[in-house]
Amino acid sequence: MNLNFEFEEGFLDKKHILVTGASKGIGREIALGLSKFGANVILHGRREDALDEIYDEIVSHYKTDPIIIKCDLNLLDEDKSKEIAEVISKNTPCLDGIINNAAILGKMSSIADFDLGTWQKVLNTNLTSSFLLVKYLTPLMENSERPRIIFTSSGVATKGKAFWGAYAISKAAVKSLSEILQEELEPLSKIKVFNFDPGATRTSMRAYAYPAEDPSSLKDASSLLNYYLWFFSAKSENKDIRYIQYNASNS
C-alpha cells in the first residue's frame, strides 16, 4: 500500500463526513485535515467548549460548513441515534463518511478486578455506539458517490493483552463488526468499510496507558491524515485489504 502521492486540495469539496471524538486527539487532527481538503465535517464530541473551539478553528481557516453533534456515546440509545440521523439528514444532501474514532480506555486492570460500571461504559462508548451510528446513518449514504465507513482499531484488537480489559475486548469486537459490515454492505451498495490501526500515537489515552513513555518519541496524530484521505479517494475503491495498519513510510 503506497500513500506517497499528493492529494489535490478541494478533492473532498461538498463531502459530508462524520468524525466521532472530533474535539481532541486523533479525531481532532483528522477533522482539521479533512476540512483543509474541503470536507464539511460533522464534529461529534462530548464537551461543548471543545467542540466550539475546533468549530471556530475550522471556519476561520477553511471555507467549509462544519456541524456540531454533542453527545455522550456512553448514553447513546436508539432515540438519540435517530435524532442524530435526523439532524444530519436535514443539514446535508447525503452522508459521505462515518469515521468511528471516539473511544475510552476505561482503566488498566485485570479482569478479576474490573468493575462492571467501567466495563459497561467502555463497551457502550467504543462498541455499542458504533453499532447504533452505523445502523441509523448508513441509509443517509445511499446517494453518496464514494461512501466510506472507517473504524479505528488497535494492536490489542488482533491479540488480547493482560490488563487491557474492556478496551481490548471492545476493539476486538469492533474489528469483527467491521468485517461483518464488509460482507453485508459491500456486495449490495457502494459503501466500503475499513478498519484502521493508527499504531502508537501521541495522545492523552496513550499517555495514560504508558505513563513512563517519552511522548516526544511518538508520531503526532496529524501524520495519519494521508490514510484518511486515501480512504475517501478513488485509489481505495478496488482495495481488497480492509484492515489497514499504520506504516511510517506512508505518512
Tell what function each PLM region has.
Residues 84, 109-111, 118-120:
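Substrate-binding pocket helix/loop in short-chain dehydrogenase/reductase
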Residues 101-107:
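Conserved NAD(P)H cofactor-binding loop of Rossmann-fold oxidoreductase domains
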Residues 191-196, 203, 211-251:
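C-terminal helical subdomain
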Residues 37-54:
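Conserved glycine-rich Rossmann-like NAD(P)H-binding loop of the short-chain dehydrogenase/reductase
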